[in-house]
Amino acid sequence: MIIAPSVLSFSYDRFNEQLSDLNSSVDWLHFDVMDGNFVPNLSFGPDILKTFRRNSSLFLDVHLMVNDPGYFTDVFANAGADSITFHYEAYNDLRKCEILIEKIHSLYLKAGISIKPNTDVETIFPILDKCDIVLVMSVEPGYGGQKFIDSSLNKIKKLDEYRKQKGLHYVIEVDGGINDRNAYDVIENGGDALVAGSFIFDGNILNNVEKLRNIK
């Protein structure tokens, strides 16, 4: 299991304390980048990523919720990303998605594709052999603290079945409403990486991470 706290929920007034806890307990850090167009909210730019890169050796997982992921790919690659995931819905065109995946790989980064809750997961099957990460949004993207959408479990299961059928090795990452009550179902259906914001940062980080680790 990969635990990937969402930096959207990070308390910057407790930067050193919280990052120290994360550095000692989790696997990835997940950065939701929003442009105010693809999703209603704005989040942060590459300088935040650079700050984390200087202070952490964790895998930095960038999720682009933007209208022009090609532009932001260069910016965040230069800031220290280890992976860049973008939305199929930014293009609604598999060939354009393939081209950007190739570009991300040319920068020696892991490449991921993400889908919103209303997108049929089978839409992206033709390009999954090119992907290192498939990110299932289990809430509508753009806001933290939402309730997990149960129908996401069927998408996760389909992705896992397709992965086994085709002998592929992409990581199935799940983002939205993750907690210690639904994480078991996510893992049971084939999920590999849990993106959690509110659940990890509300209260004691180390204790909350341990609750996820203990899920069998």
Q: How should these model regions be labeled?
A:
Residues I84-N92, L135-G145, N189-V209:
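Glycine-rich phosphate-binding active-site loops on the catalytic face of alpha/beta enzymes
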Residues E17-L22, G70-N78, T119-K130, I178-A193:
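Catalytic cores of alpha/beta
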Residues I3-S6, L29-F31, L60-L64, I84-F86, ...:
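Hydrophobic faces of well-ordered beta-strands that scaffold small-molecule active sites
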Residues L100, K155, I187, F199-K216:
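C-terminal helical cap(s) of enzyme catalytic domains, especially alpha/beta-barrels
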Residues D35-S43, D47, P117, F125-K157, ...:
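Glycine/Thr-rich beta-alpha phosphate-binding loop at enzyme active sites
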Residues H30-K103:
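N-terminal active-site wall of soluble small-molecule enzyme domains
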Residues L42-V62, K103-G112, S152-I172, G176, ...:
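Alpha-helix-loop-beta-strand connector modules within alpha/beta enzyme cores
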Residues F15, L22, D32, F76, ...:
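Conserved, mostly hydrophobic/aromatic
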